[in-house]
Amino acid sequence: MEPWAGCCIFLRGFSFLLVLMTEGAKGGPFKESLGVCSKQTLLVPLRYNESYSQPVYRPYLTLCAGRRICSTYRTTYRVAWREVRREVQQTHVVCCQGWKKPHPGALTCEAICSKPCLNGGVCAGPDQCECASGWAGKHCHVDVDECRTSLTLCSHGCLNTLGSFTCSCPNPLVLGPDGRACAGGPPESSTSAGILSVAVREADSEEHALRREVAELRGRLERLEQWATQAGAWVRAVLPVAPEDLRPEQVAELWGRGDRIESLSDQVLLLEERLGACSCEDNSLGPGLHG
């Protein structure tokens, strides 16, 4: 058989002769699922063309024994078409009033609600909403105040929220794992005093380092002030020569030394401020702790 000789179906057209077989005719309307009033099976006769492999016998001549010419045949295949007629079953459901099919070929029905069900509600029946927890009303638009129900939801305080509620506890109690019952707060850490003691020692070490840095800068400042005094004497020795008679390198050197003196003075003031901030009074670290 050739590779192209497989079967394929080509629909040319079909006519419908519907034979209704309504289920539940004896015992009332058939209900397969919610909202389905009847179910019908339709016998639909179909007529279409179908391709198939048709054998073809072709004669040919061949050489037989005794050098005789014989006539025989071989089989080949070709694609041919034939008309097929058969009946197929189709199922059709009829929805009850207030229900509809999700799509035309569906075998189930869903309820129709004229207004949508809000806040996670679902349409469970004709114009009937099934609301999610925490909501009520015809269209699930009313928030339920759980805190005013007869049920004890929280061991202490209860606060209503949209669609739910939250519990609260008075100090020093805290909410437990279930979010409703209150339990004792976490015990005060026994290492708090030790942590503060370490902080005090670190602050003392930083203060000593700052004091050393201030002393070093003060020494440098004193040396620069001595040089400034000498420079002033030198300037006075140069004067009463007019300032415009000073050489440019002399003016530049004077300005540079003055800038360094001003910069060091600013650093000393900044360190003194930091040193003052590090100084702690006896009760600044809490009761019972001293620097």
From Swiss-Prot:
A GO BP annotation: vasculogenesis
Record's keyword annotation contains Transferase: no
Coiled-coil blocks: 198-231
Gene Ontology CC terms: cell surface; extracellular region
Residues listed as glycosylation sites in the UniProt record: 49
InterPro entries the record matches: Dev_Signal_Modulators, EGF-like_Ca-bd_dom, EGF-like_dom, EGF-type_Asp/Asn_hydroxyl_site, EGF_Ca-bd_CS, EMI_domain, Growth_fac_rcpt_cys_sf, NOTCH1_EGF-like
Disulfide partners: 37-96, 64-70, 95-109, 113-123, 117-129, 131-140, 147-158, 154-167, 169-182
Subcellular location: Secreted
UniProt signal peptide: 1-27
GO molecular function: calcium ion binding; signaling receptor binding
Pfam families, per database record: EGF_CA, EMI
Principal subcellular localization: secreted
Keywords: Calcium, Coiled coil, Disulfide bond, EGF-like domain, Glycoprotein, Repeat, Secreted, Signal
Positions of the EMI domain: 33-111
Protein name: Epidermal growth factor-like protein 8
Domain EGF-like span(s) in chain numbering: 110-141, 143-183
